[in-house]
């Protein structure tokens, strides 16, 4: 009986094998095409498809900067970007933008998107940061207590042309270098090195197994890969400070004990201020739907904290004037965890996507857009990253002071700015490779330095334009045409 059963099973298996072999010989697949997965056999070569795009958009074309005659002037652009912000804080924002040309660039993502929409693009889309300037890279903590180097600001993230991020990074490096006192050759070389590192890293990722490329983490290997050894000392110092930059340290400096137990924020105007009870209650109540946006495995962690206080806190340069709160949580031992609840405004580049031939996405919730964009671009993201709505406005929620640290690119020595450029260029390539096939972008970028030189030429030209825009803003402030509060 057992022998007969075994024989029957063997015959059946042989029949299946013969059927599979026959189907394969006739070009018939045993399995159907599965939605969400790559087709088999592969259809075409992404590398060759990317290479073919050079015929329509030569790599040298990226040096082109032709400003639209209808381009808004700097003062009008700043005033327009202030719309919808808290009016009492817009002078502070203008004052920060007027500090230097690099600061102006940081606050004028919308104006640059207007200009970029009129530059050549290949049509390759990916998840882009939308504001990938040199100061938007930094260190932050992962769930295991380690530090990761990556992009760290995604307010403007959207699906768009990869070239826009790379050009914004290159321009910012020129401006940061000039502010640091570097000569023009050094500044131009930094922009060129960023593009070169982007190109080489994309080629490296294109050759790796898909899972290895996806999980490539920025660490010492990245510094070695990008030849950024002169930057190691600076990164170690920043990392040391970042490890101490925690919720506990912030709470120790910014809160006080209250009678009956617990703590509350201590006002430090104009940066940190108390808010009316009704406003604080609205923010606290909005944490309930926020919890629902987290993975179920994270919810028991927050259930071990009580909400003690809410305050308003001014942040950033481009973000000044948006509504941003800090929420103090305390566990059973009185140990703090601080969350940031930050208003999520529409991405500044979205109105310009159609001009570049990209579809304008439907966005059901701006906080959700920011969070999902961040998770797509980063290898490791904040485990408490989520979104909510406060009094009809969308917000993103994240940990505040999660061992964050950053390098000030405008304070780097001349022998470090090119190292920083290579590191950030490589990080940007890794982030873009999550939203687009790296083989496609690598095929377009190629092996030689044609793209690098074009990006450097564009960066210098646009940096010059930004300096003119900055000068126009400073003149308008002096003439009383726009209000500014400098030095805060």
What are these regions (language model features)?
Residues 158, 258-259, 273, 280, ...:
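Long, low-complexity, charge-biased intrinsically disordered regions
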Residues 263, 267-300, 309:
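Surface-exposed beta-loop-beta
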Residues 25-32, 41:
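Catalytic cores of glycan-processing enzymes that make or break glycosidic bonds
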Residues 34, 39-90, 95-129, 134-238, ...:
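Conserved ATP-binding subdomain of kinase catalytic cores across diverse folds
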Residues 204-280:
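Sequence-structural signature of the catalytic-core scaffold of metal-dependent phosphohydrolases
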Residues 2-20:
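Asp/Glu-rich intrinsically disordered low-complexity tracts
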């Amino acid at each position: 009986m057992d022998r007969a059963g075994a024989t029957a099973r063997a015959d059946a298996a042989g029949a299946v094998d013969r059927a599979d072999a026959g189907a394969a010989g006739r070009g018939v697949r045993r399995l159907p095409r599965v939605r969400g997965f790559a087709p088999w056999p592969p259809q075409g070569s992404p590398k060759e498809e990317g290479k073919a795009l050079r015929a329509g958009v030569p790599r040298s074309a990226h040096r082109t900067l032709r400003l639209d005659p209808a381009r808004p002037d700097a003062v009008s652009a700043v005033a327009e970007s202030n719309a919808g912000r808290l009016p009492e804080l817009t002078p502070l924002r203008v004052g920060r933008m007027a500090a230097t040309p690099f600061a102006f660039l940081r606050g004028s993502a919308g104006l640059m998107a207007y200009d970029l929409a009129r530059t050549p693009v290949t049509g390759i889309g990916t998840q882009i940061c939308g504001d990938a300037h040199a100061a938007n890279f930094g260190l932050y903590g992962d769930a295991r207590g380690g530090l990761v180097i990556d992009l760290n600001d995604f307010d403007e993230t959207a699906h768009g042309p990869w070239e826009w991020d790379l050009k914004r990074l290159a321009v910012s490096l020129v401006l940061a270098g000039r502010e640091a006192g570097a000569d023009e050759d050094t500044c131009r070389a930094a922009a060129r090195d960023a593009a070169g590192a982007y190109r080489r890293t994309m080629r490296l990722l294109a050759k790796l197994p898909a899972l290895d490329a996806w999980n490539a983490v920025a660490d010492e290997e990245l510094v070695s890969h990008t030849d950024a050894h002169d930057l190691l000392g600076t990164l170690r110092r920043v990392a040391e400070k970042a490890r101490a930059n925690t919720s506990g340290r912030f709470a120790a400096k910014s809160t006080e004990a209250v009678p009956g137990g617990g703590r509350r924020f201590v006002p430090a105007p104009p940066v940190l201020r108390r808010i009316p009870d009704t406003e604080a209650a609205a923010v606290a109540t909005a944490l309930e739907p926020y919890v629902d946006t987290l993975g179920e495995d994270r919810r028991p962690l927050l259930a071990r904290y009580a909400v003690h206080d809410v305050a308003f806190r001014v942040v950033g340069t481009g973000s000044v004037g948006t509504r941003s709160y800090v929420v103090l949580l305390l566990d059973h031992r009185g140990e703090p965890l601080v969350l940031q609840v930050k208003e999520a405004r529409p991405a500044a580049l979205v109105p310009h996507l159609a001009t570049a031939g990209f579809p304008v996405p439907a966005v059901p919730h701006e906080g959700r857009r920011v969070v999902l964009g961040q998770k797509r671009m980063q290898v490791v993201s904040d485990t408490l990253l989520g979104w909510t709505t406060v009094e009809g406005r969308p917000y993103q929620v994240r940990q505040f002071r999660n061992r964050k640290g950053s390098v000030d690119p405008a304070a780097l020595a001349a022998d470090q700015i090119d190292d920083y450029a290579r590191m950030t260029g490589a990080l940007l390539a890794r982030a873009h490779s999550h939203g687009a096939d790296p083989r496609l972008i690598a095929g377009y970028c190629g092996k030689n330095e044609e793209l690098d030189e074009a990006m450097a030429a564009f960066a210098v030209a646009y940096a010059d334009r930004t300096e003119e825009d900055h000068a126009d803003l400073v003149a308008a402030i002096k003439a009383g045409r726009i209000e500014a509060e400098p030095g805060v």
